Amino acid sequence: MRKLKDIKPLELKDDVLYVINQLKLPHELVWEKLETLADYEKAIKDMIVRGAPLIGIVGAYGFYTGIKEGIDYIQVYERLKQTRPTAVNLFWALDRMKSIYEKYGNDLNLLLKEAKRIEVEDYHANRSIGGYGEVLIPKKANILTHCNTGALATAGWGTALGIIRSAFENDKDITVYVDETRPYLQGSRLTAWELLREGIPHYIITDSSAGFLMKKGMIDVIVVGADRITLNGDVANKIGTYSLSILAKHHNIPFYVAAPSSSLDFNLESGDEIPIEERNEDEVKNCHCCKVAPQQSHALNYSFDITPADNITAIITEKGIIEKPNKEKILKFFGRKLS
């Protein structure tokens, strides 16, 4: 078994949260200090931190910080909710923090304990996802992944990338193909950085070359993350995931989604109900301060798309695997009744 380094994207020191500024990677490793509610809002909105599980964890610490500042708890809750609209983990974590406040009042110790609990639970969930998921990876495999679903997107280890990490840890002979993931380049900037640190063989590819690699027989498995999963098994994830799922189905390649159960939204029937974040067009027209398009042109910049359950081979959670997901299977898996 290989020994891997673990990356922690956040650290609490003297009641202040420090986070890796993911906009600076891969060339600089910079830690940002979050001391006020406004700091937390900016960190999430501006994608200094990103990844659905990590946003939830940072949101929980942000709730604690806002209460510590003396801001009304409903205002804290609403301000943090408005930072990113698609990832359900943020709302799930804020609901937990709000519930503690409404039950016990302004008890900062209990609020901080709950935020820490959310962080620890996520880390253990990721390790469990890795354990379930790596069983699905052949002993020798070329794996395609999209965006960043590793330690940088979570409390540590990762979801889809955690499965890849677990497979490599268990001595499997894998090569990872990393979609660059325009326009924020989370694949080429963040996933490649994590894989390089671990010594996991990988190639960065342009998003548009994925289908060609599948046609050439160069991809055995696709593993992606999720920002929100609805009752029927539809998945909201980084823009480009839907296209990959169609290509995978056409080429008969297993398409796995890895996510903690906190990414399940039992209030939504299907992906049609998920609000899709549309970000500033300048993110498409400019790439890290370089202008790459006529500035007078307009650009569309949807951050997420919806992959239908029909295109998904299985959803891998910390509780186990849901094959060919649908509403009945998801409710049964989580011990809920059909309404």
Swiss-Prot record:
Location of the active site: 227
Binding site residues for substrate: 50-52, 84, 186, 237-238
Pathway: Amino-acid biosynthesis; L-methionine biosynthesis via salvage pathway; L-methionine from S-methyl-5-thio-alpha-D-ribose 1-phosphate: step 1/6
Gene Ontology molecular function terms on file: S-methyl-5-thioribose-1-phosphate isomerase activity
Site annotation Transition state stabilizer: residues: 147
Gene3D superfamilies: translation initiation factor eif-2b, domain 1, Translation initiation factor eif-2b, domain 2
EC number, UniProt record: 5.3.1.23
Keyword Amino-acid biosynthesis among UniProt keywords: yes
Keyword set includes RNA-binding: no
Reaction(s) this enzyme catalyzes, per UniProt: 5-(methylsulfanyl)-alpha-D-ribose 1-phosphate = 5-(methylsulfanyl)-D-ribulose 1-phosphate
GO annotation terms (biological process): L-methionine salvage from methylthioadenosine
NCBIfam families the UniProt entry points to: eIF-2B_rel, PRK05720.1, salvage_mtnA
Physiological role: Catalyzes the interconversion of methylthioribose-1-phosphate (MTR-1-P) into methylthioribulose-1-phosphate (MTRu-1-P).
Family: Belongs to the eIF-2B alpha/beta/delta subunits family. MtnA subfamily.
Name of the protein in question: Methylthioribose-1-phosphate isomerase
Organism the protein comes from: Sulfurihydrogenibium sp. (strain YO3AOP1)
Lineage of origin: Bacteria, Pseudomonadati, Aquificota, Aquificia, Aquificales
